[in-house]
Regions:
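Extended active-site neighborhood of metal-dependent phosphoesterases/phosphodiesterases
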Residues: 1-99, 115-120, 124-136, 144-190
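Histidine-centered catalytic micro-motifs
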Residues: 103-109, 137-145
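Gram-negative outer-membrane beta-barrel proteins
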Residues: 110-114
Length: 192
């Protein structure tokens, strides 16, 4: 059973943009629900946030959740600046946790044929991922399962967007493992 908390991050299905023709205000509904129901398993305190698990006093992992939707115009210019400051401040703070993860909906690096690497996200977050000790960078969006190691970057990049829609065509490269033949998801278990 998946009787555990679910920490959400915003992506294209959470914004009501004309490109995707989804309900306007859908993201705010999710944020409001999480705020009004703090004891539920749905955890979504803001568009970007940090959580240390299992607790802040003795964490095993620090998770920095970001909103990569800025590249599609979903964030205001001021929000983009605020998020950049937040990310840099969280990295500067450090943590007692042996693991630090970055989570965002869109992959920075991807072996999908139609999409590939996201140059805007790489420009925005790439320097921090090269300089700081981030263990894993998680993303979804691309309908594949990927585990990539990119030269010059410290974290492993995990793409897990194979939740049920049509799987994307991928190329095979030296950067890592790609599976576009079956659906799946990630369930992580960290130990000291």
């Amino acid at each position: 059973s998946l009787n555990c908390p679910f920490y959400a991050c915003a992506g294209n299905h959470d914004y009501g943009t004309a490109k995707y023709d989804f309900q306007e205000g859908k993201l705010q509904l999710q944020l409001d629900y999480a705020k009004q129901n703090p004891n539920s398993r749905w955890k979504f305190p803001s568009k970007w946030y940090t959580v240390e698990l299992p607790n802040a006093e003795n964490p095993l992992v620090k998770i920095i959740v970001l909103d990569g939707s800025f590249w599609e115009g979903a964030l205001t210019p001021q929000e983009k600046i605020e998020q950049r400051r937040f990310f840099k401040a969280e990295l500067a703070k450090g943590t007692k946790a042996p693991w630090t993860w970055m989570v965002n909906h869109y992959p920075l690096f991807s072996e999908t044929v139609d999409r590939g690497d996201n140059k805007q996200l790489i420009k925005e977050w790439g320097p921090q991922l090269q300089e700081h000790d981030i263990s894993l960078a998680f993303a979804g969006h691309d309908h594949t399962l990927q585990h990539l190691q990119v030269e010059g970057y410290k974290p492993s990049f995990i793409v897990s967007g194979a939740g049920g829609a049509r799987l994307y065509d991928c190329r095979v490269t030296e950067r890592g493992f790609v599976n576009n033949q079956e659906f799946g998801f990630n369930h992580m278990h960290e130990t000291p």
